């Protein structure tokens, strides 16, 4: 009986997908009379064991099933995940701007628009070619993000459950916690301090936490901000593109890290390493794999090579998921988190693109958003890369052959449609993406983690950065220099004598302001006061 129900569910699913696609793909699509070439960026995460991101079975599958049908050459361009702006700058300077330009961070796409690398678009024309994609933007209330400086440049993809960030999780050594008397993961900062110091005292490791120099401008200081945060200060400082260094939450965050350093939590040579926070392989990941550190975080996927490597090196270890409230400390950290933007990729189009190339790019987006195409790209081939469960939903299988999906179920290709895979309910989505083939099943822990994050969001403690409807030109001019300064100051402030911390922070803050940050603050505040930015969410 269960098999019959499963079969019926599957048939209904596939029939509904087919009818949806037939109804929604524009009937007037015809092959181009002459061959049209489009170039599409795809993140290269340099992950060992994965096929090349720009030439693999699935890039060829898109060419065969979409490109050949409409006389379009679809060529993928590898973009190093850890150095996005440098690669794009090189392509733009060489007059090789990809037909599609896309990024998760608004300041980056704003810079491309401001620098003339992107073309203006007409949303009515886009809607005529890509009606399903356009309607998804309407349904997700994203049309307000398509313009900058009063001109339309962007279309936006979906980000499911954007205010919970559940697709990223930090794994911790539960076996170490048990050895020092804990039957749970620390649920506030007092417990975290107690646990880390006991782990050191017990000789389980010498430096329990990994640390390196930040590789991105984003400062993880949301929890260290007052709640509610002052909206003007938020508009001036909260950014993924420029470090909000001379601001009190950054001071609080770094003062805590300084105290942790002097408690012996970090290597004294941490400043020789980079910390990519799970975006790429670095020493912090290697140390965790080798059983030297307590925790490491990354994006959740069925196949997580660093977790596989960890268990190979530590077969008797027990892991758990870190509690999102683990940094909570009255007067210091509220537990607030950065919510993702209410959109995934911000997608623009090259100013060098011809009208046919623009249309071909829009056709690719419309074709990919059709459920039957998206299903194949995210799941692969039944019996090899996935099987159907009793509920009729795909269950990913361990597979490393020719048809292997790339990072996180091909997300760096399907991000042209949405930021993460979504299947049924949130519980089903998590179960479907939970790491497979490990000694432990993390599905329930990840579901529990989602509901803790949901609680944080429901309390109003999850919000994102402001999005500006005008270009902040000073950011384009100074951001690279300011990131370099932040990296320098970070190392010095973490290592300095605690008695010298406040004086050094004040000195470095003034230097940071003088190096261009004051201009950025002024320009962002002017845009905010002119009504050219989003506002903080209003508590319900």
What do the PLM-derived regions correspond to, one by one?
Residues 13, 21-540:
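Extracytoplasmic/secretory soluble proteins
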Residues 1-9:
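Positively charged n-region of N-terminal signal peptides that target proteins for export
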Residues 8-16:
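Bacterial N-terminal signal peptides
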